């Protein structure tokens, strides 16, 4: 090569450089000589680059300044460019439509450099010509080559020129050396927001050299990328700031200041050369500068740029020493800055994609172009996650293989910081290979990671940052040019060894050990086993195991079956679905509590951020659950199923959970088995979980078999969820139990009591409400719990019996951390069984409902609770419990009643104490009992001295007593004068007043003294109430059935009867017939059996008749039917029952700290507004056994029954508890039938030893005080039999069975008793007080009720009243005018009513005598009152002994019984009989209603019913004669004898039946007269007698 060529190239290189400097852009260097010497260089200071000529694709350069530029010309002909202080300010361009591509920029730069060296003409002309050339096509090298060849006439010349240009380019690049220092590039991301960040890239040095074989090297040292927060420019009149158009103020002109920074620097430099303010500004900017990334040494070596036609680069080798990434600062970049950066990236990617798409559509060679990248080697990467967390990645290598695949590896990945520790042993840790079809990764060593709370917090911030970036990217990429999908999708495969992840908690490590797993993007992620260990300083336990985990990331959402919060079928569409075969969990309860507390701290990281991020986003989707529906074609109809979209879904085949030491070691462990589980997280952050099988058991060595706690009840055909959990987007948690039985064991209370810690014991006096609210937040998330078709099984403490509460639909809700909840249960059925071991589940049978299930398993349905509302609240430091029940119904037999009562008592812990803890029998200091006694009090001298005074004091004359008596008598008279009548007796209408009315309760009516009142809690004690409870029951109905529910009871009674039969048989065989003894037995303290050989069969028949209500003298009873009767025998009805409970806060000091005070523990007030006992015994004609005594002075708003109980601890440090009782009962009306009374005594006296509650320390309640009011009773008693054996044995109470009482007056006087040892002593004391009082003082009132003399006594009392009133009025007024009229009215009313009532009784008695006479002569007697189908339906009715008087057709025609329950004749009301079609008898036995029932209200009605009765009985007599006539005609024997027989049969009926009708008609007429005279009498009759009307 000629010597002049390097010098020309050197000159052209110099010219090219100078052309880029605006200061020398117009200088002509064509005749410039270059000298070779030591000072052959040019130096420039503060150089501004030509921004118009310097174009970089997708970037607008706003400023380019070089502080110092040195151009050196070397001896070898090269050019060295040394620069320092390079500062550039650029703005990325967001629009890619008119921007230049990077390839165009490179081609243009090379063309400029080559043309500047080959043109020997005017360089400016050459430069301008090449500048005007079209070199901006996409295929730059081929188009440029064609343009050059077309401009040359000869091919040889073109080839020569091309070689010269390539040669010149290679020489120029080989002789060119560039070394730049202190290069700063600032990118203004958002030019419209002055507060936005500026990204600064600083290069400490950069060097470009070319070595042998055209190998180019770019060496960059200390690259720093920082984020600068702009400082707001203060307002100034010289430099106004406009936010609306920042670009105009920043980039106004290239000759003036082109940035906020440079304009300030230049203006300040012109004013002051020393530039003190610039330094201050730079320092302030440095304070706001955050370093994001640092690269210590970056070396890039490549081949290429050797020809103008071939500008490709190949064999690119990148070598990086250290990379420092400040991740914790990157994640804090402002959202606006981050969004702008992503917008730029997405825009440029879209432009490059568009170019690549165009290029791919053009013809390309079959051979794929190899990648220009050869290898990348990064020695070390430092990831700074926080101030104390640094993750180090070493030896990251990437290498291009011959088969166009890319291999990469990571040597190590570790961290030794306290919040995060990562370690492994084998190197390299990760290797992989990328091909156009797949990416294969292989982790060659086990990875051990330990992370703390701070580490998770930093990782979560990174996760949020990445999610935010992806969200911005997805939003920006919408609407961009769609990418052309490749034919083959690249798959990702990962093979990993075991990974160990440990979470660091304050007291333990939670380690997750993941077995080697495989991931295939085309298939799924499969993990064989995941174990979770809990590492304590002393031990390590496995708490969780998950096996066979499969996670699938689906391209299209998978449709899964689910349920909504009403347990209706729904659909869930999920893109990520996981399946776990089995989950096993085992941990202690205390460890779970600690783990939950520690994990909750981690959970705050997620909840706080999610609440802030999803506030606006969830508004549109909130409530979207189950609002959409999908129509699914099912058979021949459409089924609409609600749908939901989920981010993640999980199916777990089996879950085994074991929690040990929940209460203490004695409790054992609780194990749960849940199968067929489903879990999903929806798009709007809702959580759905359900399981279709659930079983929870308690296991402990003390139990032979596992103790069931919770399980599925019925095997339904439709497999519905049994447990459903739904957390809504607003945070409300809803839990549903379906078809589940839950067990409660009272034995748990004993374990709980023994395991109460000292801390809880010391805080026993702390209010319950304060305990609930202690250390709890003021608000929480709402929750709701539902139980559908569930059952609650209650196991008592000592008994084997069990009560089941079937919950049809129970709903409860409240808010977490707040002691407030509401409960609503609509229908609850009660079941009872005597021994739970008799409960045998039939698993193979399908039951339609829970009620049928328990009824078929040996349980007895004893009642139902309708509409229960329960409320828990807190007020004034006390816990409020409010329960409201609409109705409670109980149906009980004697044995089930005892079981029910004893079970309710035994549901609590039987807390008893020995006598040493209840009493102090030995005193520490002796007491002198004679200390305060005056020994001279009874001396003769003292008595004589006070004798005179004592004589006067011995008798007190109370004058006011006589005055009060006089006032009382005057009051009685005034009452008579004002009302015109005396107060009538409720049953007989007799007067209760007179001139001198004995006030027997006068002394008892005095107000009790202050010391006699019960110790009612004071206001101060009311403030110390810990728990307030109230129970309001609108109605309680208790039905008492005869018979027995339990098989054990029935079998025992039957065996006892058989045993008596055998004993009598043996006694008869061993002795003579006359000496057979009487056998007796007492069963359950309720049934007394006495029989001999002759009446064993009668005994069975009587027992069967008493229980079932059927007396059949002709049937042979070989076995007693002891099952519950078909209908109840008695009904107890309570209305408006209210129970008020108060539990007071008391201290429990020991003896040393005691002040010997008395504590009121709790108080219970039970009130019943109205109660009645209904008599439904078949042999009884009476209606109400107990009811309110009408027309007695009793406040309408006061309850009929009030019981006030207070439990008092006399000495605070002793455990003895005493009871204070106060009883108030309203006046009562009693209608006592002997059969009903015996049934109630037998029912309530039943005692089964199996249900006796035996305590460790038997305790009898000590009644400190008992008080009751005066109770007025009005008694009707109907005896039916007399127990002569009991009378002979001395039971004087049997004498009552000789007399019938009607309206006897009894007053149980007010009693106050102290110091009673139990209720048995209370009963004896009350008998000892009330019985003598009645027999000595109230015999007139009792004898007044004797039935034979009652009417005569009432008439006599009326005559006495008339005479007495007349005499009194005559003495006062002197004449008898007005008083005679009033007294006569009273006498007439009283005597008329009593005369009529007496006539009614006489006619009714006459009717009974006539019916008995008819029956004696072969008639039906009293059975003729009703129709018996069994008698009229026999074919041989004429010859039968039980032949009916009327045939069926006739009775139907006459009485119109078809379609009606009661008999009616010609639209008349029924007479005096009724056919009870629901009779408990097996042979349609009728229930005979008393002739006194359903009396006519007045005389017209009485006459109407009298006519109906007479007509009816006349029809019966006529039918009997007509029937006899027909039988005589049908009799084949004929003859006078046969006719006489038929006439003899019909004669009694034909003669007596009209008499019966006449007596009944007279009775009805008299009843109408009596009720018309006394309007209140009919109300009393309705209370007393059963009615045959449907509306009764």
Curated annotation (Swiss-Prot):
GO molecular function: phosphatidylinositol-3-phosphate binding; protein-membrane adaptor activity
Keywords, comma-separated and alphabetical: Autophagy, Endoplasmic reticulum, Lipid transport, Membrane, Phosphoprotein, Protein transport, Transport
One Pfam short name: ATG2_CAD
Entry GO terms, CC: endoplasmic reticulum membrane; phagophore; phagophore assembly site membrane
Catalytic activity line of the entry: a 1,2-diacyl-sn-glycero-3-phosphocholine(in) = a 1,2-diacyl-sn-glycero-3-phosphocholine(out); a 1,2-diacyl-sn-glycero-3-phospho-L-serine(in) = a 1,2-diacyl-sn-glycero-3-phospho-L-serine(out); a 1,2-diacyl-sn-glycero-3-phosphoethanolamine(in) = a 1,2-diacyl-sn-glycero-3-phosphoethanolamine(out)
Main location: membrane
Membrane spanning stretches: none
Cellular compartment(s): Preautophagosomal structure membrane; Endoplasmic reticulum membrane
Record-listed Phosphoserine modification sites: 236
Topology of this chain in the membrane: Peripheral membrane protein
Gene Ontology BP terms: autophagosome assembly; autophagy of mitochondrion; glycophagy; lipid transport; piecemeal microautophagy of the nucleus; protein transport; reticulophagy
Keyword Ion transport belongs to the record: no
Cell division in keyword set: no
Stretches the record annotates as Disordered: 264-286
InterPro entries: ATG2 (IPR026849)
Function: Lipid transfer protein required for autophagosome completion and peroxisome degradation. Tethers the edge of the isolation membrane (IM) to the endoplasmic reticulum (ER) and mediates direct lipid transfer from ER to IM for IM expansion. ATG2 binds to the ER exit site (ERES), which is the membrane source for autophagosome formation, using basic residues in its N-terminal region (NR) and to the expanding edge of the IM through its C-terminal region. The latter binding is assisted by an ATG18-PtdIns3P interaction.
PANTHER family, per database record: AUTOPHAGY-RELATED 2, ISOFORM A
Family of this protein: Belongs to the ATG2 family.
Protein's recorded name: Autophagy-related protein 2
Organism of derivation: Saccharomyces cerevisiae (strain YJM789) (Baker's yeast)
Gene designation per UniProt: ATG2
């Amino acid at each position: 090569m000629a010597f002049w060529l390097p010098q020309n190239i050197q000159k052209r290189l110099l010219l090219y450089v100078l052309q880029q400097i605006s200061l020398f852009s117009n200088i002509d260097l064509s005749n410039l000589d270059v000298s070779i010497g030591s000072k052959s260089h040019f130096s420039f200071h503060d150089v501004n680059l030509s921004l118009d000529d310097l174009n970089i694709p997708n970037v607008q350069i706003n400023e380019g300044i070089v502080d110092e530029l040195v151009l050196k010309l070397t001896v070898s002909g090269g050019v060295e460019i040394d620069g320092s202080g390079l500062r550039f300010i650029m703005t990325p361009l967001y629009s890619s439509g008119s921007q230049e591509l990077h390839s165009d920029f490179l081609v243009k730069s090379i063309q400029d450099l080559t043309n500047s060296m080959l043109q020997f003409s005017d360089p400016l002309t050459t430069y301008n010509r090449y500048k005007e050339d079209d070199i901006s096509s996409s295929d730059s090298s081929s188009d440029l080559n064609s343009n050059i060849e077309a401009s040359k006439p000869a091919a040889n010349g073109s080839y020569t020129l091309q070689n010269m240009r390539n040669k010149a380019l290679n020489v120029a690049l080989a002789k060119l050396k560039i070394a730049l220092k202190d290069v700063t590039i600032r990118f203004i991301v958002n030019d419209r927001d002055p507060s936005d960040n500026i990204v600064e890239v600083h290069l400490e040095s950069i060097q470009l050299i070319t070595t042998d074989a055209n190998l180019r090297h770019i060496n960059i040292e200390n690259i720093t990328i920082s984020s600068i927060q702009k400082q707001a420019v203060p307002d100034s009149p010289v430099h106004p700031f406009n936010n609306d158009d920042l670009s105009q103020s920043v980039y106004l002109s290239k000759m003036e200041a082109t940035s906020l920074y440079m304009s300030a620097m230049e203006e300040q430099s012109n004013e002051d050369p020393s530039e003190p303010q610039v330094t201050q500004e730079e320092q302030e900017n440095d304070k706001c500068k955050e370093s994001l990334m640092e690269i210590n040494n970056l070396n890039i070596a490549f081949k290429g740029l050797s020809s103008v036609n071939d500008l490709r680069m190949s064999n690119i080798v990148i070598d990086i020493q250290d990379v420092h990434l400040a991740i914790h600062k990157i994640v804090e970049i402002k959202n606006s800055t981050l969004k702008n950066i992503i917008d730029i990236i997405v825009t440029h990617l879209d432009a490059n994609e568009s170019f690549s798409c165009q290029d791919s559509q053009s013809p390309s060679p079959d051979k794929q172009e190899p990648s220009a990248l050869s290898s990348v080697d990064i020695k070390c990467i430092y990831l700074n996650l926080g101030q104390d967390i640094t993750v180090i990645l070493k030896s990251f290598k990437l290498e291009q293989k011959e088969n166009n695949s890319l291999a990469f590896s990571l040597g190590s990945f570790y961290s030794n910081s306290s919040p995060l520790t990562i370690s492994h042993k084998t190197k390299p840790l990760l290797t992989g290979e990328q091909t156009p079809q797949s990416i294969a990764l292989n982790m060659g060593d086990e990875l051990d990671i330990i992370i703390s709370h701070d580490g998770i917090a930093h990782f979560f911030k990174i996760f949020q940052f990445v999610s935010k970036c992806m969200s911005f990217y997805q939003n920006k990429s919408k609407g961009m040019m769609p990418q052309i999908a490749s034919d083959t999708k690249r798959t990702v495969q990962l093979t990993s060894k075991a990974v160990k992840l440990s979470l660091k908690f304050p007291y333990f490590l939670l380690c997750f050990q993941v077995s080697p797993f495989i991931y295939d993007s085309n298939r799924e992620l499969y993990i064989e086993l995941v174990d979770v260990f809990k590492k304590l300083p002393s031990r390590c336990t496995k708490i969780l195991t998950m096996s066979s985990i499969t996670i699938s990331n689906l391209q299209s959402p998978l449709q899964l079956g689910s349920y909504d919060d009403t347990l209706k079928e729904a659909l869930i569409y999920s893109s990520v679905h996981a399946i776990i075969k089995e989950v096993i969990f085992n941990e202690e309860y205390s460890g779970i509590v600690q783990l939950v507390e520690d994990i909750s701290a981690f959970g705050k990281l997620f909840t706080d951020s999610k609440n802030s991020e999803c506030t606006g986003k969830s508004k549109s989707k909130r409530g979207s659950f189950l609002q959409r529906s999908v129509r699914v074609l099912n058979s021949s109809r459409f089924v609409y199923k609600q749908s939901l979209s989920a981010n993640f879904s999980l199916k777990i085949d089996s879950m085994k959970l074991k929690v040990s030491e929940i209460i203490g070691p004695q409790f054992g462990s609780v194990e749960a088995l849940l199968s067929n589980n489903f879990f999903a997280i929806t798009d709007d952050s809702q959580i759905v979980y359900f399981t279709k099988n659930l079983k929870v058991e308690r296991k402990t060595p003390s139990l032979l078999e596992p103790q069931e706690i919770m399980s599925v009840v019925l095997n339904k055909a439709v497999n519905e969820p049994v447990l459903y959990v739904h957390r809504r987007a607003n945070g409300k948690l809803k839990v549903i139990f379906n078809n589940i039985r839950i067990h409660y064991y009272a034995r748990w209370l004993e374990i709980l009591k023994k395991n109460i810690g000292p801390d809880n014991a010391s805080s026993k006096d702390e209010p319950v409400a304060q305990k609930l609210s202690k250390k709890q937040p003021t608000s929480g998330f709402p929750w709701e719990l539902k139980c559908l078709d569930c059952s609650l099984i209650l196991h008592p403490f000592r008994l084997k019996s069990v009560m089941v509460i079937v919950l049809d639909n129970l709903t409860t809700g409240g808010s977490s951390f707040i002691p407030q909840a509401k409960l609503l249960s609509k229908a609850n059925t009660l079941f009872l069984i005597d021994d739970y071991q008799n409960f045998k589940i039939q698993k193979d049978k399908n039951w339609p409902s829970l009620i049928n299930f328990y009824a078929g398993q040996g349980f007895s349905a004893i009642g139902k609770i309708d509409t229960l509302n329960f409320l828990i609240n807190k007020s004034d430091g006390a816990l409020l419990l409010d329960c409201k029940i609409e109705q409670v119904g109980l149906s009980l037999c004697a044995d089930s009643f005892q079981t029910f009562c004893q079970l309710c008592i035994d549901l609590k812990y039987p807390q008893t104490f020995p006598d040493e803890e209840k009493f102090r029998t030995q005193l520490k200091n002796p007491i002198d009992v004679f200390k305060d006694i005056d020994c001279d009090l009874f001396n003769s001298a003292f008595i004589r001295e006070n004798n005179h005074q004592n004589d006067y004091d011995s008798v007190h004359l109370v004058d006011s007593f006589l005055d009060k008596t006089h006032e009382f008598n005057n009051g009685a008279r005034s009452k008579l004068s004002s009302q015109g009548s005396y107060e009538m007796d409720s049953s007989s209408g007799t007067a209760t007043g007179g001139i001198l009315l004995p006030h027997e309760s006068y002394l008892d009516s005095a107000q009790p003294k202050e010391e006699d009142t019960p110790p009612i809690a004071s206001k101060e004690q009311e403030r110390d109430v810990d728990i307030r409870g109230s129970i309001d029951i609108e109605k309680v109905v208790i039905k008492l059935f005869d018979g027995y529910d339990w098989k054990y009871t029935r079998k025992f009674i039957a065996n006892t009867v058989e045993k008596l039969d055998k004993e009598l048989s043996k006694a008869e065989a061993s002795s003579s017939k006359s000496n057979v003894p009487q056998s007796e037995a007492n069963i359950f303290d309720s049934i007394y059996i006495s029989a001999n050989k002759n009446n064993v069969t009668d005994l069975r028949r009587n027992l069967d008749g008493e229980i079932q209500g059927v007396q059949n003298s002709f049937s042979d009873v070989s076995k007693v039917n002891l099952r519950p009767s078909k209908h109840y025998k008695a009904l107890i009805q309570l209305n408006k029952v209210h129970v008020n409970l108060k539990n007071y806060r008391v201290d429990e000091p020991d003896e040393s700290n005691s002040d010997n005070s008395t504590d009121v523990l709790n108080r219970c007030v039970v009130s019943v507004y109205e109660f009645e006992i209904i008599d439904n015994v078949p042999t009884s004609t009476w209606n109400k056994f107990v009811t309110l005594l009408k027309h007695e002075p009793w406040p309408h708003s006061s309850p009929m029954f009030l019981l006030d109980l207070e439990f008092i601890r006399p000495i605070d440090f002793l455990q003895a508890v005493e009871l204070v009782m106060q009883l108030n009962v309203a006046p009562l009306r009693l209608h006592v039938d002997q059969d009903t009374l015996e049934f109630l005594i037998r029912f309530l006296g039943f005692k089964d030893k199996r249900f006796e509650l035996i305590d460790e320390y038997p305790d009898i309640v000590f009644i400190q005080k008992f008080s009751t009011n005066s109770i007025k009773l009005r008694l009707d008693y109907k005896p039916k039999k007399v127990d002569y054996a009991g009378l002979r044995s001395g039971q004087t109470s049997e004498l009552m069975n000789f007399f019938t009482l009607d309206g006897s007056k009894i007053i149980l006087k007010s009693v106050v008793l102290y110091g009673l040892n139990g209720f048995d002593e209370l009963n004896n004391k009350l008998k000892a007080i009330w019985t003598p009082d009645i027999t000595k003082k109230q015999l007139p009132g009792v004898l007044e009720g004797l039935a034979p003399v009652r009417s005569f006594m009432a008439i006599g009392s009326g005559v006495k009243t008339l005479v007495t009133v007349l005499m009194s009025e005559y003495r006062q007024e002197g004449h008898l005018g007005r008083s005679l009229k009033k007294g006569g009215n009273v006498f007439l009313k009283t005597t008329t009513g009593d005369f009529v009532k007496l006539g009614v009784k006489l006619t009714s008695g006459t009717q009974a005598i006539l019916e008995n006479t008819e029956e004696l002569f072969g008639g039906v007697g009293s059975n003729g009152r009703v129709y018996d189908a069994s008698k009229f339906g026999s074919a041989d009715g004429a010859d039968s002994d039980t032949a009916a008087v009327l045939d069926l057709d006739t009775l139907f025609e006459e009485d119109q019984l078809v379609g009606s329950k009661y008999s009616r004749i010609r639209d008349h009301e029924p007479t005096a009989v009724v056919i009870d079609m629901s009779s408990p008898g097996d042979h349609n036995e009728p229930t005979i209603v008393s002739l006194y029932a359903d009396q006519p209200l007045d005389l017209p009605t009485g006459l109407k019913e009298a006519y109906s009765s007479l007509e009816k009985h006349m029809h019966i007599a006529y039918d009997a004669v007509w029937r006899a006539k027909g039988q005589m005609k049908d009799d084949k024997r004929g003859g006078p004898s046969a006719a006489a027989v038929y006439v003899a049969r019909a004669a009694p009926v034909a003669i007596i039946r009209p008499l019966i009708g006449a007596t009944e008609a007279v009775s009805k007429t008299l009843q109408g007269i009596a009720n018309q005279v006394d309007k209140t009498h009919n109300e009393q009759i309705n209370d007393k007698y059963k009615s045959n009307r449907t509306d009764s």
